[in-house]
C-alpha cells in the first residue's frame, strides 16, 4: 500500500513544484500530520464505509479550505476514494520528495549528552562534506548506552563512532582469534 501513498505524494509534489507552492504544501502537510496524530475520531470517520462521499467532501472543504489548490485537489481525490486515512504517510513521502529536490536529508545524532548548537553545526559540516548533501536537518538524541562518542544516522546509513561500538568491534576481533 505504501506505493500508493508515494505515488500520491510524488504527483502532489510535481504539481505543487510546477505551481511554485511546494514549500507551503509541505508546511501544510506537516501541520495536518501533527494535527491528525492520535486523532482517533478522524481515522474512525475516514475509515467508516457508511460515511458518504458528500460528507467526506464537506469535511475536506470545511477543514482544509486554507490549503493550496494542489493539496485541496488531492484531499478531494482521497475523499472520493475513501483514502483520507493515508494522509499521514502521504505527508512523509512528500517530505522525502521535497528533501530530495532540495538536496537535504534528516540526520539523527545520538550522543551521551545533549550537544550544543555549535557542536551540532560542526558535525553537520563534516557530514555535508562526506555525503554531498546541501543541508542536513539535525536532531540530537541523548543515548547513554553509547558510553562516549556519537552515532549518526542519515537515511538508512549509520555512522557509528561510539565507544560502545568500538568495544563491540574489539570483542568480535578477540573471538576471531
From Swiss-Prot:
One term of GO molecular function: proton-transporting ATP synthase activity, rotational mechanism
Mode of membrane association: Peripheral membrane protein
Annotated compartments: Cell membrane
Any one annotated GO CC term: plasma membrane
Bridged cysteine pairs (disulfide): none
Record bears the keyword NAD: no
One Pfam family linked to the record: OSCP
Sorted UniProt keywords: ATP synthesis, Cell membrane, CF(1), Hydrogen ion transport, Ion transport, Membrane, Transport
Major subcellular location class: membrane
Superkingdom, taxonomy of origin: Bacteria
Subunit: F-type ATPases have 2 components, F(1) - the catalytic core - and F(0) - the membrane proton channel. F(1) has five subunits: alpha(3), beta(3), gamma(1), delta(1), epsilon(1). F(0) has three main subunits: a(1), b(2) and c(10-14). The alpha and beta chains form an alternating ring which encloses part of the gamma chain. F(1) is attached to F(0) by a central stalk formed by the gamma and epsilon chains, while a peripheral stalk is formed by the delta and b chains.
Similarity remark: Belongs to the ATPase delta chain family.
Cited function: F(1)F(0) ATP synthase produces ATP from ADP in the presence of a proton or sodium gradient. F-type ATPases consist of two structural domains, F(1) containing the extramembraneous catalytic core and F(0) containing the membrane proton channel, linked together by a central stalk and a peripheral stalk. During catalysis, ATP synthesis in the catalytic domain of F(1) is coupled via a rotary mechanism of the central stalk subunits to proton translocation. This protein is part of the stalk that links CF(0) to CF(1). It either transmits conformational changes from CF(0) to CF(1) or is implicated in proton conduction.
Protein name in the entry: ATP synthase subunit delta
Organism the protein comes from: Macrococcus caseolyticus (strain JCSC5402)
Lineage: Bacteria, Bacillati, Bacillota, Bacilli, Bacillales
Encoding gene (name): atpH
Amino acid at each position: 500500500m505504501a506505493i500508493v501513498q508515494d505515488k500520491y505524494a510524488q504527483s502532489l509534489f510535481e504539481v505543487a513544484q510546477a505551481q511554485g507552492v511546494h514549500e507551503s504544501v509541505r508546511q501544510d502537510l506537516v501541520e495536518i500530520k501533527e494535527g491528525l496524530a492520535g486523532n482517533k475520531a478522524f481515522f474512525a470517520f475516514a475509515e467508516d464505509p457508511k460515511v458518504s462521499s458528500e460528507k467526506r467532501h464537506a469535511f475536506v472543504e470545511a477543514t482544509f479550505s486554507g490549503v493550496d489548490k494542489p493539496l485541496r485537489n488531492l484531499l478531494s481525490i482521497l475523499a472520493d476514494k475513501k483514502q483520507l486515512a493515508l494522509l499521514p504517510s502521504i505527508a512523509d513521502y512528500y517530505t522525502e520528495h521535497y528533501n530530495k529536490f532540495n538536496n537535504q536529508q534528516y540526520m539523527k545524532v545520538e550522543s551521551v549528552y545533549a550537544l550544543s548548537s555549535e557542536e551540532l553545526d560542526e558535525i553537520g559540516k563534516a557530514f555535508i562534506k562526506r555525503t554531498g548533501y546541501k543541508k542536513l536537518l539535525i536532531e540530537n538524541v541523548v543515548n547513554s548506552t553509547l558510553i562516549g562518542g556519537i552515532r549518526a544516522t542519515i537515511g538508512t546509513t549509520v555512522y557509528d563512532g561510539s565507544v560502545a561500538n568500538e568495544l563491540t568491534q574489539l570483542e568480535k576481533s578477540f573471538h576471531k582469534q
